[in-house]
Amino acid sequence: MNPQELKSIMGSGLLSFPLTDFDANGDFNKKGYEKRLEWLAPYGASALFAAGGTGEFFSLTGDEYPGIIQTAVDTCRGVVPIIAGAGGPTRFAIQCAQAAEKAGAHGILLLPHYLTEAGQEGLAAHVEAVCKSVKFGVIVYNRATSRLKPETLAALAERNPNLVGFKDGVGDIEAMVAIYQKMGDRFAYLGGLPTAEVYAAAYKALGTPVYSSAVFNFIPKTAMDFYKAVAADDLPTQHRLLKNFFMPYLDLRNRVPGYAVSIVKAGAKIVGHDAGPVRTPLTDLQPAEMEQLKALIDALGPQ
């Protein structure tokens, strides 16, 4: 897939990040992952991001990564495009990007590097090195320690035609407006705050109607219903789902740092699609929290 095709995929629809399946020992569970993708693929997501943040990219080894991406590509071939997460130190990010391209992924989401703070020049060098290492499309992700400014993005886009997408995980509306005004239709834009449904209507008003849904992993019908409500400006449906599910879910998710991933694995377990435990340093939900989440899910009805 050429970069412009990736940009087109990101232009509309709901995106999601499948969980990565682990067994009781915390090792990659290939068969479980295949079954998960087979279950999610028909629900209508425009693309699935393998080994993204919700897929615990930050806990995967370099040896595991190529096999996980290959499994996703092979399982979803001809059904739904696969975009791979890639990130970490520049050389490791390049290894991941090249492995994803070799596996047949449609592009990468370049996740923030780990811990190290850097200025715009260093961030740009990191992004450009990854872009230059592959031919397929790259989506850059503003989050945490990696926050590219409009001028930096413009310079990168001019030098790297395969940089075609921008995902925002910061939530700085002023910065998002500045980036959109600077870059226009040069990029496809993706809302990427945790539990993105809460912010979906606001991002749509900014010119970013596409977002990634973590809850698609366990309530795919509700996730699609909410996306359709946002697309149709159906405020009553949005407000009903926000009040009855997403805001109570948010309260539960915010109890412990790292629960943004843990609660998704908990939800998958509750609906009968157990993905196994999270890897440390994340922790699984407590039994009482599982019961609270189950009550929220049950109230939504069949998926």
Swiss-Prot record:
> What biological process terms from GO does the record include?
D-glucarate catabolic process
The EC class name is lyase
> Which reaction(s) does its UniProt entry say it catalyses?
5-dehydro-4-deoxy-D-glucarate + H(+) = 2,5-dioxopentanoate + CO2 + H2O
Top-level taxon of the source organism: Bacteria
- Output the Gene Ontology terms for molecular function: 4-hydroxy-tetrahydrodipicolinate synthase activity; 5-dehydro-4-deoxyglucarate dehydratase activity
Keywords associated with the record: Lyase
Identify its protein family.
Answer: Belongs to the DapA family.
Name of this chain's protein? Probable 5-dehydro-4-deoxyglucarate dehydratase
Which organism is this protein's natural source?
Variovorax paradoxus (strain S110)
